């Protein structure tokens, strides 16, 4: 111990411990995480050297908060890249001090605990040298050392400009460096725009993104022979999990997590270049079923906006098929209230909409969101059996939930795979295989058009555009006439048009997109917004990727999804604003403003309560999620909750969250509702800054059940007439 104490009191011990913490440990961790690139190491050294020269002779109590925050950023980087494949942004930073958000995001644990332990150990070692060496003088660093950060940052900047690299940001940058570079670029763009002056931006041509295109050559000689339609949406599955897709684009990703689905793909038509336009289940379902882009900016989901409209919803696929004689059905493994699917699905044309409450079979494993995938598909098989008994043709849309965080799988799967996420995917693959094999034995595949796809992509670390890479596997009775690989760029906006075109039914002009059952001899425009990046392909070989709103890189790329693309340069100014203008125009396809629309999330449904609240998301009693509130607006909320059982009280909590972080609105922590004295509230709050992804979580517990007869939300500008009082109930955003 005395030898260690003497070493810790050496004059250079504090400097060496700081170098270990901010230079050696980050470089080693980058290598261990598999993020090894010359630019990444250069960025680590630049940030580390800056910390060394800045903190070496500072008092320990000044340096410690800086180093703790730096270490927290490093941990957050690894965790967020592991979870969703992107670096944290400035809007994420304040979430790091929210314990509930951290717990919900990590499932109570870290994806990379060794990284956190290494940083903590190095930080404790540095602090020990500071405390033991108190009173000892610190030698000044040579003047040449002060130039090291400048030289390293300049070298990184020069390398990026002389030999541009389009790799993932976390492979090229240390997070503080990336945030600094982004801020500098923003200031540069603002200066350029200030020098240009106020220039009115012309409206870009939108026909290529919004019009129906049926000009391709039909793949089928006659209208499709299928009697029924089955759409299976798999939660979060990227296109790279299908072997045929990987081979078609030459992907380096070779993990075969879904071998069964890949074997089914050998029997069907695959579309390798298939674009998912946004994150979130409700947005993916809207694009699929209503032939339109959902918001490309985290605004109010268009499915919620659709509740205010009584004409556009009739153009959605379920309504169109119902009009042509189909019975239309929606079944998912989770509860329906979250994201208001209990209201949206009937409104767009489903005759029957069912969630967790429909299932009578037991789960095979505990899962907070609802049915595990094996139990779900067993229930879905019974549902199809009921549909087969009717004479009417049917359309059934299925949505799984088992591959949603937190990933759950049986113990034997967890032993077989490296991560719970992979185990959950493998469990889904086996369950889906058994379901499809059962349909084949029952003869369902002989007269049913089956489309297997995903609602969104949970991404894959190190796979280019994985967050936007979807898949579309089509199994049709006339499969021999269809190609195994469908060449061309398609996306979720094409699905409704495609199915109507398959049956040779008229396609409403309100829909967008191309038909998967036609061969086109020209490119097409298409967009996506995932992982904070707006992406646009102009249909003429140029793919652009923009950090919102005014800074873009562009590449030469024949299609949208590709293993690699030829980097051509960067641009800002008018071309970048035109891409943003296209996204803005798509966002306004339903409503021109988020103001003055009353959303009614209440209903006369009886909702059983649990003995305790387990999860703010899965236990939500209403679907008021991911709303948008403009800057300077005023939001008013009115609610009525009644306990159904006269002998039982219901204990109610109301929380507000923005981007999943709690927002304090001054509401009571807990309230009571009884049959004789319902809980009635009417409150409002200001929006001094824009709010997006704003959600209400109405939670309850007790031994009885409740009725949420009213949960009205309206956002308006101060001084406007209060629509919440004046609009009749039958003109509000609610479905029948």
Each language-model region and where it sits:
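Extracellular and organelle-lumenal recognition/adhesion modules and their flexible linkers in secreted
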Residues: 602-734
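Generic alpha-helical structural element
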Residues: 17, 61, 88, 108, ...
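Short alpha-helical hairpin
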Residues: 21-29, 202-205, 400-403
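Transmembrane and membrane-interface helices of multi-pass
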Residues: 2-185
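Membrane-interface segments at or immediately adjacent to transmembrane helices
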Residues: 101, 153-233
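Solvent-exposed soluble domains appended to multi-pass membrane proteins
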Residues: 210-608, 689-693, 710, 714, ...
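Juxtamembrane/interfacial segments around transmembrane helices
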Residues: 66-71, 91-95, 114-127, 191-205, ...
């Amino acid at each position: 111990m005395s030898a260690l104490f003497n070493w810790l009191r050496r004059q250079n011990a504090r400097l060496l411990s700081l170098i270990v913490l901010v230079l050696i440990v980050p470089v080693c961790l980058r290598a261990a995480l598999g993020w090894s690139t010359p630019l990444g190491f250069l960025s680590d050294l630049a940030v580390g050297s800056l910390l060394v020269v800045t903190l070496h002779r500072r008092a320990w109590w000044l340096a410690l908060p800086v180093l703790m925050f730096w270490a927290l950023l490093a941990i957050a980087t690894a965790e967020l890249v592991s979870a969703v494949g992107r670096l944290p942004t400035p809007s994420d930073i304040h979430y790091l001090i929210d314990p509930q958000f951290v717990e919900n995001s990590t499932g109570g644990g870290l994806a990379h605990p060794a990284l956190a332990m290494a940083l903590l150990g190095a930080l404790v070692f540095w602090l020990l040298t500071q405390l033991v060496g108190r009173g000892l003088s610190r030698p000044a660093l040579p003047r040449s050392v002060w130039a090291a950060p400048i030289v390293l940052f300049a070298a990184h900047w020069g390398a990026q400009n002389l030999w541009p690299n389009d790799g993932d940001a976390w492979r090229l940058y240390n997070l503080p460096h990336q945030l600094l570079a982004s801020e500098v670029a923003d200031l540069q763009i603002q200066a350029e725009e200030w020098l240009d002056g106020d220039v009115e931006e012309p409206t870009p041509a939108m026909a290529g993104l919004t019009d129906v295109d049926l000009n391709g050559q039909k793949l089928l000689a006659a209208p499709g022979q299928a009697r029924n339609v089955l759409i299976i949406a798999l939660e979060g599955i990227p296109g790279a999990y299908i072997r045929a897709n990987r081979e078609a684009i030459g992907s380096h990703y070779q993990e075969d997590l879904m071998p069964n689905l890949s074997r089914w793909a050998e029997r069907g038509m695959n579309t390798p270049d298939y674009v998912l336009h946004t994150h979130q289940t409700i947005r993916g379902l809207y694009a699929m079923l209503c032939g339109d882009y959902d918001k490309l900016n985290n605004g109010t989901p268009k499915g919620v906006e659709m509740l205010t409209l009584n004409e556009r919803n009739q153009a959605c696929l379920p309504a169109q098929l119902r009009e042509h004689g189909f019975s239309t059905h929606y079944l998912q493994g989770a509860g329906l209230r979250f994201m208001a699917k209990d209201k949206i699905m009937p409104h767009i044309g489903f005759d029957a909409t069912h969630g967790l409450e429909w299932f009578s079979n037991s789960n095979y494993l505990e899962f907070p969101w609802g049915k595990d995938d094996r139990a779900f598909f067993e229930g879905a098989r019974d549902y199809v059996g009921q549909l087969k008994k009717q004479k009417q043709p049917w359309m059934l849309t299925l949505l799984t939930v088992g591959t949603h965080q937190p990933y759950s799988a049986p113990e034997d799967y967890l032993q077989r795979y490296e991560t719970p996420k992979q185990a959950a995917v493998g469990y889904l693959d086996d369950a889906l295989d058994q379901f499809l094999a059962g349909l084949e034995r029952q003869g369902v595949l002989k007269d049913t058009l089956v489309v297997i796809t995903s609602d969104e992509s949970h991404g894959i670390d190190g796979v280019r555009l994985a967050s936007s890479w979807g898949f579309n596997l089509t199994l049709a009775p006339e499969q021999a006439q269809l190609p195994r690989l469908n060449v061309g760029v398609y996306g979720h906006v094409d699905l409704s048009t495609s199915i109507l075109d398959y049956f040779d039914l008229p396609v409403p002009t309100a829909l967008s997109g191309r038909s998967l059952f036609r061969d086109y001899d020209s490119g097409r425009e298409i967009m996506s917004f995932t992982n904070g990046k707006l992406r646009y392909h102009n249909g003429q070989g140029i793919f652009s990727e923009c950090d919102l709103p005014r800074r873009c890189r562009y590449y030469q790329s024949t299609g949208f999804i590709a293993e690699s693309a030829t980097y051509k340069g960067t641009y800002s100014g008018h071309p970048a604003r035109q891409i943003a203008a296209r996204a803005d125009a798509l966002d306004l396809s339903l409503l021109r403003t988020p103001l003055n629309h009353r959303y009614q999330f209440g209903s006369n449904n009886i909702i059983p309560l649990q003995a305790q609240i387990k999860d703010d998301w899965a236990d939500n009693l209403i679907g008021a999620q991911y709303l948008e509130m403009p800057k300077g607006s005023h939001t008013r909320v009115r609610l009525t909750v009644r306990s159904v059982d006269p002998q039982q009280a219901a204990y109610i909590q109301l929380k507000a969250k923005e981007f999943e972080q709690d927002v304090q609105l001054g509401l009571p922590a807990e309230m009571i509702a009884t049959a004789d004295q319902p809980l009635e509230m009417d409150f409002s709050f200001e929006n001094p800054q824009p709010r997006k992804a704003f959600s209400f979580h109405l939670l309850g517990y007790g031994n009885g059940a409740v009725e949420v007869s009213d949960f009205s939300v309206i956002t308006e500008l101060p001084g406007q007439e209060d629509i919440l009082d004046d609009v009749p109930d039958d003109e509000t955003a609610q479905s029948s």
